[in-house]
Amino acid sequence: MNSIINRRVLIKSLLLSLFSSGFSLADSNNHKKFTIIFGSCSNQNNKMDHWQTIINYKPDLLILLGDNVYGDFNNESANQLKQAYKKLSENSNFQYIKNNIPIISIWDDHDYGINDGGRNWEYKNIAKKLFLDFFSVNSNDVRYKRDGIYNSDEILLFNKKIKIVSLDTRYF
């Protein structure tokens, strides 16, 4: 278990260090720019200035890598997680982002519901529904019907399809 956690931390850290807060891709033919911002570890109980910073970059896509809220809970009411999502949803900058910038999101342990949680977390399906509902995933989406929230999304970038695969390293 410890080596799995260390690998997750290492992979997440490498991704974040590679891309820092984001990066831009340019089309050499017509100098268009496409900006992607990566984010994670957004504790709703701290100052949330980072949402304004994201808006200032005017990204074309926001990829949230987990710990989008900190809502660890220990019973089926999941009140802590519900309150965490509620607090984030009340942030005007996050509201702007959610309404104006495409978001691809995956969870990590704190939006999964338990610190360092994995496949044996008894309330993982409660956390899953709250996550999908919060990020306005269409109710017909396959993630509502299958285990986990892993997914692949395609974006069109300079007339080329880019596939972004989000792995669920908690549910399984």
Where are these regions (language model features)?
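N-terminal secretory signal peptides and thylakoid transit peptides that target proteins
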Residues: 2-18
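Active-site neighborhood of divalent metal-dependent phosphoester/pyrophosphate hydrolases
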Residues: 31-172
